[in-house]
Amino acid sequence: MIMAAEEVFWRNPKYHAFAQAIRTIPLRERDVKEAEERLRRFAPYIAKVFPETQPAHGIIESPLVRIPNMQRRLEKMFQTNIEGDLLLKCDSHLPISGSIKARGGIYEVLKHAEDLALANGMIAIGEDYAVMASEEFRQFFSRYSLVVGSTGNLGLSIGIIGAQLGFRVTVHMSADAKQWKKDLLRSKGVTVIEHLTDYNKVVEEARRQSAEDPTSYFIDDENSIHLFLGYAVAAFRLKKQLEDMNITVDETHPLFVYLPCGVGGGPGGVTFGLKLVYGDHVHCFFAEPTHSPCMLLGLMTGEHDRVSVQDFGLDNKTEADGLAVGRPSRLVGNMLENVISGVYTVDDSTLYRLLAAMVETEEIYLEPSALAGVAGPVRLFRDSAGQTYVEENDLKEKMKNAVHICWATGGSMVPKGVMEAYYREGMRIETMTGNCFSEGR
């Protein structure tokens, strides 16, 4: 079924209790807390140069919202009862770059900036980092360059923050990157190099170019611990959001989180953070396009980055540009092979249908890749492998108290015309399936 690019749900047979799984992971909670502390140090700078972050005092965070109308629509569309509450984590609306990549990407650039500033005696820990907005600092950072390979959103986050600090930034974009993302980066003074190859080849080329320049810093989407830790911080923020909403996560109130997955750094970091916070009470599932199930194949075979989707006859072509990755992260696969609960795949047509449904029911606009997570609760309840997971983990009687969080990874930066075209495509597909939304909300 995978090789036929059909939707599948796979439960991970290597999934273990977290106390056991963490023994083979070289990171601990203190590493995530250190990343959180660094982001706090930079908050005055962020608030100064990105006014949209001032209400949150320079902390880059997204809303967590209940989506009951969408929950009912999903039940109707797929003839499936979803037990528990459905929520959306709106990283699609993160300030600065409008995607989950604003977490890891911005964090790694800030860490590099801090390292350079400290090493050159420009600043000391404890001082006000808002001073980095000065021309003196911009001149200093302009002596250095940043290089990254991206399908789109990581390039956006690194390009925007890097250019703001004063770095010379080069973003290598794969063939599937959307034109508007390239245009936006160029408008910020970022050098965009377009490639005709797919994501993994682009990263290889970006890495090679960066290695030739001693002032260059390469942000390695496939293997970066710093990106991973930037994403992991999200879990501690989410814990507070759930508490503020009076939502309990414990033995009898399980939490299910559905995360769109490209190379794996974003969902991997978030999963690690969530496991540190909630242990075995949280269950994390990755969502991939049917044509680009790289993490699924890496985990299933145990070969991780040694296999690609092309090895299995798949073309890695999907409208979910952020997830169009043919080979998974070795770092994430190795670290989390006993931590990820499972992986499911979603067809592009399903993504478009869900995109239109989210607009219709909740008036929330997401890009296609962000909808991969929204399919999760349906798949858990509808697919036999999902139900086997529930039964094997003694969750059946607890599902009525379950909390389901779909992680919306991007969307708010999409130009209006492009978003309208996405919506029309979703409505067109929905009409063809004979499931039109005309019954109202």
UniProtKB/Swiss-Prot annotation:
It catalyses: D-serine = pyruvate + NH4(+). This is Probable D-serine dehydratase. InterPro entries: D_Ser_am_lyase, Ser/Thr_Dehydratase, Ser/Thr_deHydtase_PyrdxlP-BS, TrpB-like_PALP, TrpB-like_PALP_sf. Its EC number is 4.3.1.18. It is an enzyme of class 4 (lyase). GO terms for biological process: D-serine catabolic process; isoleucine biosynthetic process. CDD domains: D-Ser-dehyd (cd06447). GO terms for molecular function: D-serine ammonia-lyase activity; hydro-lyase activity; pyridoxal phosphate binding. Its cofactor is pyridoxal 5'-phosphate. Belongs to the serine/threonine dehydratase family. DsdA subfamily. The keyword RNA-binding does not apply. The modification N6-(pyridoxal phosphate)lysine is found at K101. NCBIfam families: D_Ser_am_lyase (TIGR02035), PRK02991.1 (NF002823). The keyword Ribonucleoprotein does not apply. Keywords: Lyase, Pyridoxal phosphate.
